[in-house]
Swiss-Prot record:
Gene Ontology cellular component annotations, sorted alphabetically: virion component
Binding site for S-adenosyl-L-methionine: G135, D228
Organism: African swine fever virus (isolate Warthog/Namibia/Wart80/1980) (ASFV)
Protein name: Probable methyltransferase EP424R
Lineage, top ranks: Viruses, Varidnaviria, Bamfordvirae, Nucleocytoviricota, Pokkesviricetes
Taxonomy, superkingdom: Viruses
Length: 424
């Protein structure tokens, strides 16, 4: 049964469907009780990876239909206008900001709030948010903690990549860094001469170890670790997972080095077909009582974005595990971290997630987007008019399902409204 339903009956465009999944997608993965054996370099029987490679090919074939449109500025602009029109959350961000006194309401804010509301974490009152600017995750956690959990305080630390050039702007669009410098772990290039200088780059092993140390020195215990990192791949979406392997490993390792026992973790990923990504998920399965692959409804269904969620950390690293993983990051290669043949049941669950999120939902939406492009190339206003009534219904429903309440002024984050990206 399709995840989507028809809403415009009759007439020339009766094929139009809403672009909203009926549910928050959440696929559970089994906990692994057997010992974790990390390997610096290993091989995997091709049969284990065959269906993941096939899934990658199928998805990339559909993505490739958009590639010619990216080559010309005019067609690229039209395509993005169409994709923006079928974004069921367009307009919701402003409504949330003004109706609920919310701050930094980006799409990241919506996703994090939805994750918090759906995953039922035991405690989120102390958080380390990595790869964080401009600050949507922190703001959503702050809003959720005070309006839903009613914690007396919310304590947080954060980090983001600080540009290497002193002339480049830090993406501090809302002034969260500028007005809260003591909460941030990374440092300006002006401090390069310091022995423990750290620019927040989680692809550098020494940075990862240092960030985890700084986080735990400033905030203990850490109940929630989040990381929303992603490298801009331009138009090369077919290699999005591959190009982000090292970054996603680094942000995960930072979390596993800093998150307290009993804590929860949320990590951004894209497709989940590469052997290294699969092995990293296998590693996670040894540390959390519950592990999930998720796709919030507010995560645009035309993209490959997924979030891996770990609930209730059961144990910390052994010294040997920490040493092996840091060494792998320092001398990175993308062979699996573990012998994947030992994780057949878990990989079946991961593949079910791949089928559900990418082979069904994403492909259906990409095809829908291309059909809208062909039919509404010069009629974008007409498309918007058709979709507007259902967008309102869906956005109102989303607000009810996710239990939004007004944030009291005294609980708002300190922001510097004048900041537009650059920080002195």
């Amino acid at each position: 049964m399709s995840n989507y339903y028809y809403y415009y009956g009759g007439g020339r465009y009766d094929w139009l469907k809403t672009v909203e999944p009926t549910n928050f997608l959440k696929i559970g993965l089994p906990y692994q009780a057997h010992p974790l054996h990390l390997q610096h370099q290993t091989t995997t029987p091709p049969s284990i990876l065959e269906k993941f490679k096939r899934a990658d090919i199928l998805l990339n074939e559909v993505k490739a239909e958009m590639d010619p449109l990216m080559l010309q500025p005019e067609t690229e602009k039209k395509l993005f206008q169409i994709l923006s029109s079928i974004d069921m959350f367009k307009g919701l961000r402003k409504k949330v900001e003004f109706t609920y006194n919310a701050q930094i309401v980006t799409n990241a804010w919506l996703k994090m709030y939805e994750l918090l509301n759906t995953m039922n974490f035991n405690n989120t009152s102390q958080a380390f948010c990595n790869c964080e600017l401009p600050g949507g995750f922190i703001s959503a956690i702050n809003h959720f903690n005070y309006t839903m959990m009613h914690y007396p305080t919310f304590n947080w630390v954060a980090s983001s990549l600080y540009p290497s050039s002193e002339t480049d702007a830090l993406e501090d669009h809302y002034g969260l860094y500028q007005c809260n410098p003591d909460n941030w772990l990374m440092q300006s290039p002006l401090l390069k001469k310091n022995m423990d200088y750290n620019n927040g780059d989680v692809t550098i092993a020494s940075n990862v170890k240092n960030l985890a140390l700084r986080a735990t020195q400033r905030l203990t215990p850490i109940h929630l670790y989040t990381a929303d990192g992603g490298i801009n791949v331009g138009h090369d979406y077919n290699k999005q997972e591959e190009l982000n392997l090292k970054l996603h490993f680094g942000q995960a390792l930072t979390g596993l080095l800093s998150l307290s026992k009993g804590g929860n973790m949320i990590l951004k990923h894209y497709t989940l077909n590469h052997a290294f990504t699969l092995s990293l998920i296998c590693v996670f399965s040894h540390f959390f009582e519950e592990l999930y692959i998720t796709k919030p409804t507010s995560s645009r269904p035309t993209n490959s974005e997924t979030y891996i969620v770990g609930k209730n950390r059961l144990r910390l690293f052994t010294p040997k595990e920490e040493q092996v993983l840091l060494k792998r990051l320092e001398f990175f290669n993308d062979t699996p971290l573990v012998d994947l043949s030992l994780y057949q049941n878990l990989l079946e669950s991961v593949y079910f997630a791949v089928e559900t999120i990418h082979l069904k939902q994403q492909i259906e939406f990409l095809n829908f987007g291309m059909k809208c492009y062909r039919h509404f190339y010069n009629k974008i206003k007409l498309l918007n008019d058709y979709l507007a009534p259902k967008k309102k219904i869906f956005q109102d429903r989303w607000r009810v399902l996710n239990k939004l309440y007004v944030l009291e002024k005294k609980h708002k984050l300190k922001l510097c409204a004048a900041s537009q990206g650059s920080v002195a």
